[in-house]
């Protein structure tokens, strides 16, 4: 330990950086493993999750996916008595966010529909009161956390909330409180309602996900066959399948407000292990860097009677102590990370040690194990060097010593290059998402959900908005283009003339407001109030029997409904209807103005879109629009949002993973630089005399710095050659999550090389500059 204290006093910065690097590597390992654990344990809090499955059916329609997950609730009657199905329940496919009011205060809540048997099926645990023994789901229940946020210490049972739904406020009475579910669960914490009985007998309301619990997972295949035979008796093409509930939330089909994107658990685990390996490389390199400095004292102690075993034991104990200090540092970093809201935005779920006891133990044991292995290797290596080399002072230049140091550092370079390239590709995809041609102009567009009080004043509201000097155009619509993967779906007709498409309800000015180009025919006009369609080019090509200026159902038998027989007035160019997870160019879609015959469907155009003219400030426009809404004497708040900025929400999970990879790449490069710093320290200690002689013989400081920096060229090139295909493969794999994505440009590779190489060379120059500028006489004296 005396030597350790001596070394710390002499090389304070290098020692502290070494400990910081290992601490950061351990903390990074722990954080990424919490994310893997978060994904792996998704829905494991649900009752009998190992035997619970979601029902999906093959989609022969024009949906952008091959499988469909939404059904009318009536379909349950086909399956209730099938063999091997113990229970069957439903969940609304759209978890909503609703505004609720209590004592004049407004709150945003998750709002979820569940089947009447949800308590027994999902394992919902009611609070300890009279409701705890019931088996049927009450009509409205609140989670504990939500109840505390609204009611505080009051008893919520029997209290009335006012929720805004379907353009009106209505009271709901809280009938129970359930215990909170973990964040990684399909059952969200908020307001749960039982509503499926409203849709019994209604085969047109396709909004429910159906879940079944089997008596044994081994019967999955036979149940899939039974589901298909019980429903598709005359079809050999369509079928059902069962998806484990653990995987359901990460499916692209899932429409609840949880994650829709799941980074590969293997990738997350690899990243966490790489973090630990980079820390190990750095720690080992630092231990080896100390070896030449303690060689002479070790030989002296051997002469005085110390055994090789005792010297090795001392070095091992020193390294174990340093590992323990690094563990404490990692724990401190994680606690600091946990206290920072900005940092916590980089992770999902809870990262506290008490909720990850097993992972904490694994991290502790793994780190200590790695520390011991590193210590054993360093101790064996340092004590196995022939004494003659040490006495001559030539160990630092021996081929074996140089090769080992460069191999370790090259391994760090490989990881740094691969992750930098990976991060660059992700950055390219982020740029592509924000800057691709969407087929509509998303810039300078504000939108808002219309308050209930304004629904019946839409004409007046539009008139007043149009009068504002900064408004170029405005319109009402039901949906926001490009921010979802599923919209209202219509299927009409039969046989060869069956059509299926995404139906988007709009008003006559929507295409003009969104700057969507008409390819054939005309745009909507005020005379289309009785109903009209504008198809996208994909729908026009897919269903060629649909003709311009003719009713859409002219050549279609069995339209199935008495309404919607409107003419097709135009064909517009394709636009990005869904997110980039799907190829919008393959999805038939139609804008529709709903006529008086569809009045029973209600007014679906509840969002207002406003295009701001060039030269006007968007923030000031937003402020004035919100003030205008307030003048309608509505108690509800109305917040306008920027359409282009809402992409951040659409790709929230992808952007989270991108941020995590960038964070890892930064830490990886930082730890690698610590390794470079230590190796340069090692080199300069053993080449002091050589540098002094070179300077006496006329070498300049520039030439000495070039001598040190030039030695890194071959390891950097070798590492890049190894890292480039690795980075390309993992980047290609990640891009497969998007149907539309950026290419991997050739210049990503030299850019990654330049980024890492530049910071490495700068580190070498800064560290070796101290020796290069030192008086050569002093170096010769000390050597």
Residue ranges and their predicted role:
Residues 3-13, 17, 21, 279-322, ...:
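Intracellular coupling helices
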Residues 115-127, 138-260, 463-649:
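Mid-to-C-terminal secondary-structure elements
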Residues 27, 31, 241, 320-387, ...:
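Small-residue-rich transmembrane alpha-helices
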Residues 263-286, 658-678, 722, 726, ...:
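Internal alpha-helical transmembrane segments of multipass membrane proteins
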Residues 32-97, 199-200, 205-213, 222-226, ...:
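Membrane-proximal extracellular/periplasmic loop immediately following the first transmembrane helix
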Residues 10-40, 50, 405-429, 440, ...:
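Short, strongly hydrophobic transmembrane alpha-helices
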Residues 635-716, 720, 731:
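C-terminal transmembrane helical bundles of large multi-pass transporters
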Residues 6, 10-11, 46, 228-272, ...:
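Membrane-helix entry/capping segments
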């Amino acid at each position: 330990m005396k030597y350790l204290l001596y070394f710390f006093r002499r090389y304070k910065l290098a020692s502290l950086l070494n400990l910081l690097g290992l601490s950061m590597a351990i903390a990074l390992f722990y954080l990424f493993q919490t994310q893997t654990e978060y994904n792996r344990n998704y829905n494991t809090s649900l009752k009998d999750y190992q035997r619970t499955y979601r029902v999906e059916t093959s989609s022969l329609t024009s949906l952008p996916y091959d499988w469909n997950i939404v059904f009318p609730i009536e379909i349950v009657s086909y399956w209730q008595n099938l063999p091997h199905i113990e229970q069957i329940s439903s969940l609304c496919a759209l978890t909503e966010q609703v505004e609720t009011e209590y004592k004049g205060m407004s709150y945003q809540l998750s709002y979820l529909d569940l089947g009447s048997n949800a308590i027994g099926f999902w394992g919902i645990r009611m609070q300890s009161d009279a409701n705890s023994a019931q088996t049927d789901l009450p009509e409205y229940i609140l989670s504990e956390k939500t109840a505390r946020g609204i009611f505080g210490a009051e008893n919520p049972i029997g209290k009335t909330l006012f929720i805004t739904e379907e353009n009106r406020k209505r009271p709901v009475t809280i009938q129970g409180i359930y215990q909170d579910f973990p964040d990684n669960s399909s059952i969200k914490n908020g307001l749960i309602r039982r509503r499926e009985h409203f849709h019994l007998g209604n085969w047109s309301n396709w909004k429910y996900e159906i879940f079944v619990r089997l008596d044994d997972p081994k019967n999955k295949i036979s149940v899939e066959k039974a589901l298909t035979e019980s429903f598709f008796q005359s079809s050999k093409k369509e079928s059902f399948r069962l998806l484990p509930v653990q995987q359901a939330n990460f499916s692209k089909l899932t429409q609840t407000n949880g994650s829709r994107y799941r980074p590969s658990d293997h990738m997350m685990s690899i990243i966490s292990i790489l973090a630990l390996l980079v820390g190990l490389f750095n720690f080992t390199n630092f231990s080896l860097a100390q070896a030449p400095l303690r060689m002479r004292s070790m030989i002296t102690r051997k002469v005085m009677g110390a055994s090789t075993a005792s010297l090795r034991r001392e070095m091992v104990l020193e390294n174990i102590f340093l590992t323990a200090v690094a563990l404490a540092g990692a724990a401190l970093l994680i606690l600091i990370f946990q206290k920072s809201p900005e940092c916590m935005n980089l992770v999902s779920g809870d990262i506290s040690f008490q909720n990850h006891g097993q992972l904490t133990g694994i991290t502790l044991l793994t780190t200590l194990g790695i520390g011991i292995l590193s210590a054993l290797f360093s101790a064996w290596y340092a004590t196995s060097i022939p004494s003659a080399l040490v006495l001559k002072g030539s160990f630092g230049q021996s081929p074996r010593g140089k090769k080992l140091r460069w191999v370790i550092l090259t391994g760090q370079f490989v990881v740094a290059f691969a992750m930098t390239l990976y991060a660059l590709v992700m950055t390219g995809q982020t740029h592509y998402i924000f800057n691709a041609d969407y087929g509509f102009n998303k810039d300078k567009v504000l939108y808002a959900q219309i308050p209930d009080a304004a629904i019946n004043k839409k004409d007046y509201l539009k008139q007043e908005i149009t009068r504002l000097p900064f408004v170029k155009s405005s319109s009402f619509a039901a949906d926001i283009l490009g921010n979802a993967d599923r919209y209202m779906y219509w299927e009409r007709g039969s046989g060869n003339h069956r059509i299926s498409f995404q139906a988007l309800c709009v008003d006559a000015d929507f295409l003009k407001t969104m700057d969507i180009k008409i390819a054939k025919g005309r745009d909507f006009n005020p005379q289309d109030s009785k109903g009209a369609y504008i198809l996208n080019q994909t729908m026009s090509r897919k269903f060629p029997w649909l003709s311009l200026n003719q009713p859409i159902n002219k050549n279609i038998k069995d339209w199935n409904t008495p309404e919607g027989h409107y003419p097709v007035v135009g064909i517009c160019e394709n636009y990005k209807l869904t997110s980039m997870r799907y190829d919008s160019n393959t999805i038939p879609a139609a804008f529709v103005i709903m006529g008086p015959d569809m009045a029973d469907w209600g007014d679906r155009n509840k969002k207002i879109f406003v295009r701001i003219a060039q030269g006007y400030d968007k923030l000031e426009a937003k402020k004035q629009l919100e003030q205008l809404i307030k003048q309608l004497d509505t108690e509800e708040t109305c917040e306008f949002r920027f359409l282009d900025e809402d992409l951040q929400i659409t790709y929230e999970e992808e952007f989270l993973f991108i941020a995590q990879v960038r964070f890892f790449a930064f830490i990886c490069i930082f730890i690698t630089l610590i390794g470079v710093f230590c190796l340069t320290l090692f080199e300069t200690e053993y080449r002091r005399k050589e540098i002094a002689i070179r300077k006496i013989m006329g070498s300049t400081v520039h030439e000495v710095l070039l001598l040190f920096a030039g030695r890194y060229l071959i390891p950097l090139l070798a590492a890049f050659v190894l890292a480039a295909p690795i980075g390309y493969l993992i980047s290609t794999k990640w891009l497969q999550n998007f149907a539309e994505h950026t290419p991997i440009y050739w210049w990503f590779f030299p850019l990654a090389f330049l980024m890492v190489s530049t910071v490495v060379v700068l580190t070498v120059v800064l560290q070796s500059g101290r020796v290069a500028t030192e008086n050569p006489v002093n170096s010769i004296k000390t050597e």
